[in-house]
């Protein structure tokens, strides 16, 4: 496919956020701000964003707050936005539709 992948924050430390929460709200807030700034920079240097929106917490095609912000940053910067699965049926649906993501329904060949 010829794509270079930029991994999301904490990819190699999936439980880091839970550890930061245990350190207290101030430490967690500082860590979260640092992660959000870092992710914005990653989106800025990328051609597109591919969101792997799988089931989580019992919700199909889950997109959390931080991921929504990444999608918005990509939209703001004019980047392509790909969703692995359809847009979730939740309170962010209209906003997500407005950003015009390309739903690939699991077909990675559509990421071009």
Map each language-model feature to its residues.
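Conserved catalytic or regulatory cores that recognize and/or transform ribose-phosphate-containing ligands
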Residues: 1-112
